[in-house]
Structures are given as structure tokens and as C-alpha cells.
């Protein structure tokens, strides 16, 4: 049959293959005319001739009236008279054109924003590059203790007069001393008491002294109403001891108040727990508060527990107290070292090098700006890893005491970045009752340290029971904290720690997509958060307005690009005729979110487009094969795909023509892009993937039509293909900016199999009951029950869930272990498995996205700017 070719100008048939020496090659989508080739795309209402780089489109008259398959769009459908498609309607897409256009008109990224982004990146790189032993704010409390030290030359002057001058110059307007930008009564009371004692000792600053006493007298009577949630570390030890000292100095302060009596009782109870054996042989947190233990401590014995740097747990106050009792030169050298750094004051804790580096890395990662600082992050983590200890780490490289907060943060981040670290380090912080605490042998724990252990526990590998124990313990603790309205922290005062805990519990790692976490943390991050030792302190390299500003600008810039891509994909879907199909789900935006929530960077634009198009086609063909198409139609469609033959279109009903042309055109276009990217032809490779996919769909259709329930193993073998994850990924990886990618992953890859299997099991767990109501008899749960007729449905469900959890742990191991698979490919595979967990969190989130929380996630990630 002669094929007419349409003139690009007149739209009139100008020749035929016979008269123009033209050849049409169906499997390549090419027309060759007089020796020149053009690729064509066919769709229900147009032919697009591709010449050179640009597509040139010319409308045809209705194709059923032409000689190009003259009956291809006729009303005949060839459906067997005894086949009736199921009467199942899917919800329409929430994301229609009006909604998309109205939302995406909300903001545009300006040129000034892009310049500001570059400026902020440069400034934050400077933060990384200037990290030393830790940037932290002044501690009036510790500075007052250092200012007490008399000159070592015997003169009646302070050894560090600049610290005394700092106290005189830094009294706050209300007469107190302490953290200026955050009022915490405990902090102000303790710092003020320390300062007025120091001024009394040196008989100076009468004005400041009287103002300080006045503040103290007014504030201490209000302390009965203060909650214990943010009482500074060691307050009950040092505060009563300092009151005794103030009394001996003749300071006119109230000493008989209920609050003071309560603190005295707490101190006595704590001192009773201290044994001589522990005090002088084991480094514990008591070393942090030695200034409050002078009446019971033999300071000559305590010296042997001194840290390498000469301090006692990095506390200037504790170290100053020991020096005044012993004259130890290493104590003095430490204080001189700190003052060389800070000049006229000292911080609450120093150094804080490990703490600062880990929290800065965690901050930029959670805010989604880490891609701008890859080298800086590696340098910071190399430093931390060089200090890693199998017993755990503390806040500084030479800290003699490990804490679970820094250890858990370090374990999680180092493992995620490929460092070899063992979770056995957590055993240090587990007591005989199976509970986890911040310090070995202590009973203290707070929300942030338990939250960090919980986050850490989720990067577990198979067989790591300590991680499972940590997860159960911390999850229980955090849920109780929320239920009891006790989501306050012992170690930090954060903008929205409750929000952080709620997010972590609702969206654990395998369900939390990167952009979803970023959007949440932008709202929870506090650029003015403060930490709590013996006094409040700020860490400007951790809590910083610049991080938040960059996070918002960067998020909105990327989001603007994503919106442009969505509009293009919606147009593609419409021009392909897919919106006219009534039997399937229109889920362009949802499938785009599935990839953009992970591979969000501008350089992965083609990757996102391909992922979305393949996903849309999978949804359509899944619905076609899953009951709407008759057995003969399915067989015909599969044969057309196998032969890649457009001539079979004339035997198809209209809806199948749309499906086949959409698949045909998209695969050819993707293959051409893949050839450019990979440097070799990939059309055969992509077609083969689709043949495998449709074979799996066909097998499921045969099971459904025959009411056949396979064995569990037989089901799993097919189901991990039919879920479509492998088809999506094995095509999309061609566009992850990696060379020779196909040498690293294929259908036999364990990593890919686990991603497919966990996605399938998650889907079955949440949808099998609804599918059964629609006549489906095959799911992992039903197949497992067939193999074991004696078990209940609940037991089968429990088994399938346990299998999925174990496979997720295996997936962790495959993702994080060191091998030759490129990181971008790993990330795409792993996050596709994660997004499957997210979509099935409440049920079938793809089908019913308009009524589930997934809709809100899409809004926040793709349409609502961060403000």
C-alpha cells in the first residue's frame, strides 16, 4: 500500500513511496525520501517530521481518511463478544491544567536571587574552611570563675584581668548576666550569682554588684514556677555550693526559699550516689562540675583524671576551680589557650570540634543545600573519622567521655557517606535493662539525643541487633514524650523540636524523601537555637541565618524549574492522547513527584522527564492489561511491541492505538536521547525491557482471568517485574550522567531486585484488601496463605511485612556498601524504593492521591514556595 507524505506547507499529499522512492521503516520510525531520512512521530491527530534538530509539525486530515492505515482509527475494536471490561472508575487527576497554572504563577526566581545564592554559597564555604576547635558564644558563668583566679606572681590582682573587665562591661540591662538573646531563668540566675561573687572577691564594680544582687533577689523568688525542663547541667550541684560561698562572703541574698531548699535536697541526693571508687578512678560527668564539689573532692587525687588538653571535660569553670585548689600548670595552660582564642572571655565548653563539624554537616544536608559543599563536607567528615573510637566519641577529639548524641550522629552520617563504622559503638550507652542513655553509667537522656539515636538506628544492616534495640527503645521514648507533652530537651532549646520528632516518627528514613525532609526542616530549623551546658550558649556555625536563607532561595529556584518541567510533561501527556483514555489513571504530577523528590538537581532534568514518561506509560499499560483489555487485545498489543510494528495498529481499537503510539513514540525518542548520552544505540535494550514488562503484565492477567492463585515463590518471581520498578530504573539510569552505566546494573542486580521487591510488598500490604474487593485474587498475602492453609490472614500479613523489613535492611547494605556502582545510579534506585514506601503509607497513594496526604507532599515540594 502506498503511503502518502504530506507537504509541510500545503498539507496536501505530494507523493507516495512508489513515486518518490520513499521507504518507511516501522521499527525505526523513519521515512527515507530520495536518500534523505527523517524520523517521524505518529499520534492520533498529527504527524511530526523531525528534520535536523527541530521538530516540524503539520496537521493531517483525520487519519482514518488517509491512505496511512486507512482504518486505523475506525470504530471497530475487535473485542470478543463474550468479554466485558470491568466497570472500575479511577478518581480524576487533582492536578488539572487550571490548578497547575494557578499554583505555578505564584513565584518566579529573579536574577538577584541567583546572585544572592552564589554569594551565600561562598560565605558558607568560608564557614566550613574556618572551622577549628569550635565557634561558640561567651559564658558569663565560666568567665566569672576564670576571673576569680589570683595572679600566679603573688600580686593582689587577677591572673586574667581582661575577664574581670568583661564582666564589668557585659552586664545586661536588667542587672543580670547570661545569654543576651534568650532568657532562661536558671541560666541568668546562675551566671548572675557567679558574677556577683567574683565582683565581691575583687571588691570592684559596686554599681554592677548592686544591680546584680537586685536582679537575683527578684528572680529567685519566682523560681518555684520554673519548670525543670531546661535546668542547666549540674545546676543542682553548683548552685547550692555557690550560695554557701555567697553567704560566707556576707552577700545579702535570700537563702531560705522553697526553691533553694529544693535544690539543696537534690544536691544531697546526688552526692549520696557518689562513691570514692567512682570519683577518683573513672572519668564521669562529675568532672564537668568540680567547682561545686570542693568540700568533698580531694583535688590532688582528681588530677589523674585530667584530659589531655589540661581541662576537666572542657569546662573552663571546673578547670579554673581545680587550678585554684592545686596550682596545676596544665590547667593554667588550658585556660591560657582558650583565652588566646576568645581574648577576654571563655565559653561554656571548649573545644567543640567534633560536635560543630557533625552538626554543620547535618544542618546543610537537612536543609537540602549540601550539594554545594561536597568537598567541604568530605573534609569535615574525614576529620571526624580520624577521631572515631569504637567506644564512641564526645564533643571534642580529646574528650575522655563519649556521649550517645555525638556518637549516634557520627555513626549515621559517616555510614551514609561510605565510612566503615560499626554500630556496636552504641553498646557503650546501653544499660542492663536495655535502655539507652546519653552518658555511660548515667541516667540522663534528652529528646535530641534520643532523636539522633532513632535516626541512626534506621541505617541498619541485616543482623545488626543493636540497631533494632536502639530503634525500639528510642521510638518508645519519643512517642511517650509527644503523648505526655514532654517534647522538651535537656541539651538544647530549639525552635520546634516537637515538629522534628513528629516528622521523624511519621516519616522514618525509608519513607522520607529528600525534598520532603528539606521542606519540613526549613520550617523547623531555628537559626537562633541555643544549647545548654552549665549555661546557655550559641553555636553560630550550626545555627545561622545564612543557611536558612540559602535553603529557601535554593529550594524555590529548583522548584521553579520543576514547575516548568511539569507543564511540559502535562502537554506531552495531552498531545499523546492519554488524557482521552477513560480506563486509566492520569497521574503525571504524582509520577513526576516520585523522581523529583529525590533527583531534584537541575542537571537531572532529562532524567526526571524520562522517569515520568516511562512511569505514566506503565500506569496506562498496567490498567490496560489489568482487566480492561481482552485476552486477544493484550496478545495483539504484546505482539506489536515485540515486532515494533505500526502495521498492527489497524487491528487495534482506538484506545489501544493511543497506547501503542504513545509507547512507540516515547521509546523512540528516549532511545535517541539515550544514544546521544551513552554513545551507542539503546533502542533494542529499551524495547527488550518493555517486552519483559508486558510479559509480566500478561502473566498476571492470565492468573486473574483464570482465578489462579500461584505459590508465593512463583508470585514473587513475577511480581518483582510487574511492579515496573526495574523497567523505570533500567531506562532512566541512562540519564544519570554516568558513562557505561549498563555495565553496573541489570535485571540480575541484587540491589535492583530488592528495590522492586520492597515496592511490591509495600503495595500488596496496603492494597490487597481493596484489590480483592475488585475481584483480584492474587497478592503476596493470598499466595502465602495458599502455601500455608493453616495460618490466618493476619499471620500472613505479619510474615509479608517482616519480609519487607528484612529486605529494606538488605537494601540499606547494598546502597551503602562500597562498590563500583556510580552514586547517582545508587541514589535513583534506593530512592525509588523509598518513594514506594511513601506512596503506600496510607493505602494506594498513586490511585487516590487526591484524598491522601501525598497530595499535600506534592504541593509543598513542587508548588508552594518556601517562605
Swiss-Prot record:
Domain of life per record: Eukaryota
Compartments (UniProt record): Plastid, Chloroplast
Cofactor(s) of this protein: Mg(2+)
A GO MF label: magnesium ion binding
Transit peptide, residues from-to: 1-49
Family: Belongs to the terpene synthase family. Tpsd subfamily.
The name this protein goes by in its record: Bifunctional cis-abienol synthase, chloroplastic
Species for this entry: Abies balsamea (Balsam fir)
Gene that encodes the chain: CAS
Amino acid at each position: 500500500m502506498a503511503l502518502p507524505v504530506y507537504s509541510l506547507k500545503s498539507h496536501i499529499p505530494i507523493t507516495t513511496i512508489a513515486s518518490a522512492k520513499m521507504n518507511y521503516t516501522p521499527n525505526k520510525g523513519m521515512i527515507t525520501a530520495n536518500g534523505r531520512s527523517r524520523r517521524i512521530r505518529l499520534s492520533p491527530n498529527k504527524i511530526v517530521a523531525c528534520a535536523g534538530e527541530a521538530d516540524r509539525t503539520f496537521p493531517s486530515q483525520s487519519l482514518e481518511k488517509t491512505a496511512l492505515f486507512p482504518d486505523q482509527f475506525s470504530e471497530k475494536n475487535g473485542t470478543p463478544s463474550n468479554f466485558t471490561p470491568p466497570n472500575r472508575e479511577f478518581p480524576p487527576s487533582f492536578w488539572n491544567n487550571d490548578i497547575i497554572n494557578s499554583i505555578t504563577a505564584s513565584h518566579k526566581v529573579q536574577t538577584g536571587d541567583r546572585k544572592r545564592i552564589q554569594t551565600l554559597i561562598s560565605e558558607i564555604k568560608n564557614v566550613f574552611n574556618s572551622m577549628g576547635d569550635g565557634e561558640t558564644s561567651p559564658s558569663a558563668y565560666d568567665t566569672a570563675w576564670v576571673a576569680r583566679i589570683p595572679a600566679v606572681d603573688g600580686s593582689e590582682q587577677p591572673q586574667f584581668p581582661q575577664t574581670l573587665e568583661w564582666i564589668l562591661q557585659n552586664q545586661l540591662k536588667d542587672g543580670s548576666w547570661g545569654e543576651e538573646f534568650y532568657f532562661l531563668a536558671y541560666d541568668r540566675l546562675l551566671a548572675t550569682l557567679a558574677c556577683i561573687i567574683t565582683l565581691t572577691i575583687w571588691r570592684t564594680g559596686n554599681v554592677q554588684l548592686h544591680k546584680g544582687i537586685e536582679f537575683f533577689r527578684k528572680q529567685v523568688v519566682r523560681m518555684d514556677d520554673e519548670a525543670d525542663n531546661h535546668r542547666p547541667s549540674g545546676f543542682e550541684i553548683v548552685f547550692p555550693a555557690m550560695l554557701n560561698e555567697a553567704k560566707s562572703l556576707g552577700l545579702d541574698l535570700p537563702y531560705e526559699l522553697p526553691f533553694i531548699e529544693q535544690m539543696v535536697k537534690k544536691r544531697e541526693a546526688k552526692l549520696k550516689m557518689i562513691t570514692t571508687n567512682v570519683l577518683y578512678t573513672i572519668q564521669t560527668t562529675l568532672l564537668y562540675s568540680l567547682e561545686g564539689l570542693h568540700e568533698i573532692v580531694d583535688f590532688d587525687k582528681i588530677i589523674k583524671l585530667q584530659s589531655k588538653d589540661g581541662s576537666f571535660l572542657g569546662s573552663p569553670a571546673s578547670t579554673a576551680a581545680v587550678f585554684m585548689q592545686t596550682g596545676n600548670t596544665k590547667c593554667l595552660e588550658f585556660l591560657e589557650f582558650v583565652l588566646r582564642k576568645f581574648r577576654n572571655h571563655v565559653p561554656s565548653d571548649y573545644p567543640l570540634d567534633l560536635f560543630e563539624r557533625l552538626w554543620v554537616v547535618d544542618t546543610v544536608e537537612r536543609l537540602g543545600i549540601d550539594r554545594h559543599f561536597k568537598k567541604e563536607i568530605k573534609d569535615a567528615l574525614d576529620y571526624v573519622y580520624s577521631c572515631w573510637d569504637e567506644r564512641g566519641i564526645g564533643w571534642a577529639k580529646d574528650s575522655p567521655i563519649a556521649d550517645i548524641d555525638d556518637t549516634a550522629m557520627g555513626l549515621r552520617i559517616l555510614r551514609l557517606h561510605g565510612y566503615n563504622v560499626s554500630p556496636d559503638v552504641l553498646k557503650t550507652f546501653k544499660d542492663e535493662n536495655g535502655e539507652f542513655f546519653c552518658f555511660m553509667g548515667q541516667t540522663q537522656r534528652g529528646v535530641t539525643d534520643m532523636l539522633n539515636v532513632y535516626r541512626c538506628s534506621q541505617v541498619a544492616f541485616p543482623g545488626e541487633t543493636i540497631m533494632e534495640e536502639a530503634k525500639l527503645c528510642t521510638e518508645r521514648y519519643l512517642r511517650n514524650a509527644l503523648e505526655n507533652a514532654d517534647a522538651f530537651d535537656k541539651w538544647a532549646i530549639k525552635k520546634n523540636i516537637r515538629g522534628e520528632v513528629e516528622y521523624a516518627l511519621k516519616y522514618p528514613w525509608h519513607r522520607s524523601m529528600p525534598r520532603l525532609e528539606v521542606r519540613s526542616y526549613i520550617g523547623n530549623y531555628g537559626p537562633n537555637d541555643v544549647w545548654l551546658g552549665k549555661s546557655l550558649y550559641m553555636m553560630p556555625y550550626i545555627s545561622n541565618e545564612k543557611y536558612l536563607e540559602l535553603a529557601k532561595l535554593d529550594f524555590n529556584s529548583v522548584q521553579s524549574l520543576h514547575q516548568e518541567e511539569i507543564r511540559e510533561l502535562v502537554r506531552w501527556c495531552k498531545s499523546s492522547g492519554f488524557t482521552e483514555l477513560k480506563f486509566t489513571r492520569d497521574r503525571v504530577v504524582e509520577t513526576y513527584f516520585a523522581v523529583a523528590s529525590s533527583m531534584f538537581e537541575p542537571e537531572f532534568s532529562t532524567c526526571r522527564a524520562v522517569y515520568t514518561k516511562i512511569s505514566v506509560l506503565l500506569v496506562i499499560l498496567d490498567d490496560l492489561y489489568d482487566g480492561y483489555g481482552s485476552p486477544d487485545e493484550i496478545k495483539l498489543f504484546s505482539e506489536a511491541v515485540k515486532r515494533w510494528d505500526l502495521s498492527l495498529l489497524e487491528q487495534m481499537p482506538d484506545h489501544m492505538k493511543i497506547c501503542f503510539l504513545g509507547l512507540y513514540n516515547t521509546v523512540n525518542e528516549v532511545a535517541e536521547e539515550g544514544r546521544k548520552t551513552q554513545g551507542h544505540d539503546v533502542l533494542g535494550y529499551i524495547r527488550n525491557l518493555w517486552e519483559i514488562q508486558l510479559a509480566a503484565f500478561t502473566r498476571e492477567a492470565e492468573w486473574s482471568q483464570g482465578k489462579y492463585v500461584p505459590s508465593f515463590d512463583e508470585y514473587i518471581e513475577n511480581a518483582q517485574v510487574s511492579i515496573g520498578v526495574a523497567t523505570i530504573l533500567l531506562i532512566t539510569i541512562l540519564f544519570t550522567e554516568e558513562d557505561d552505566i549498563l555495565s553496573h546494573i541489570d535485571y540480575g542486580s541484587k540491589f535492583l531486585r530488592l528495590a522492586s521487591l520492597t515496592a511490591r510488598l509495600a503495595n500488596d500490604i496496603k492494597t490487597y484488601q481493596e484489590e480483592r474487593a475488585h475481584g483480584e485474587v492474587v497478592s503476596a498475602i493470598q499466595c502465602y496463605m495458599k502455601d500455608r492453609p493453616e495460618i490466618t490472614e493476619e499471620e500472613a500479613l505479619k510474615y509479608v511485612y517482616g519480609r519487607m523489613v528484612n529486605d529494606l535492611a538488605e537494601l540499606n547494605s547494598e546502597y551503602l556498601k562500597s562498590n563500583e556502582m556510580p552514586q547517582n545510579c545508587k541514589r535513583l534506585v534506593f530512592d525509588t524504593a523509598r518513594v514506594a514506601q511513601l506512596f503506600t503509607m496510607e493505602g494506594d497513594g498513586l490511585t487516590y492521591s487526591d484524598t491522601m496526604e501525598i497530595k499535600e507532599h506534592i504541593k509543598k515540594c513542587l508548588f508552594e514556595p518556601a517562605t
